[in-house]
Amino acid sequence: MIVGPGVAGSKDDDSNYTPSGTMGRLHWLLKGGRSKSSNDSMSYIDVQDCAAHHIAAMENPNASGRYFSLVESWHWNDILSTLKELYPPLQLDANFKYEGEDIIRPTQFNHDRMNSLGVNVKGIKEIFEECISFFQDKGAL
């Protein structure tokens, strides 16, 4: 999921900000849209880091083929726990974590090609912190 502060809007129209797309999905989570974890994982990347990957690949004459642009994948237990830590008003069920015997391992990716582009990326927790701050600045949280 590509998330991060949007470029649309201005300081003059913060009251009209309505999160959409993947930021809308993250906003929905922070507003309590999911109160329990599913046995699945999600991959994240900051929008600015993703854009930097695109530019670096375009500018690199040796770049060809497919490049993944993502930080890593986290299980929903970790995603919701981190969002709750960063945004305490988040409402989750008391036993929100998935605790089945069949708990999955988050999807793993080889980052060698992505890292060859030389772009330093933010971690998921930092991405979430910036998104929450952005929503708060816009009055959406």
Where do the protein language model's features map onto the residues?
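Conserved C-terminal active-site "lid" loop/helix of NAD(P)H-dependent oxidoreductases
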Residues: 100-119
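Substrate-positioning beta->alpha
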Residues: 18-25, 36-56
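Glycine/proline-rich active-site loop of Rossmann-fold NAD(P)-dependent oxidoreductases
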Residues: 4-23, 57-67
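Mid/C-terminal beta-alpha module of Rossmann-like enzyme folds, strongest
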Residues: 41, 51-104, 131-135, 139-141
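Conserved sequence/active-site signature of Rossmann-fold short-chain dehydrogenase/reductase
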Residues: 2-4, 50
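An acidic site on a long C-lobe helix of protein kinase domains
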Residues: 46-50, 75, 123
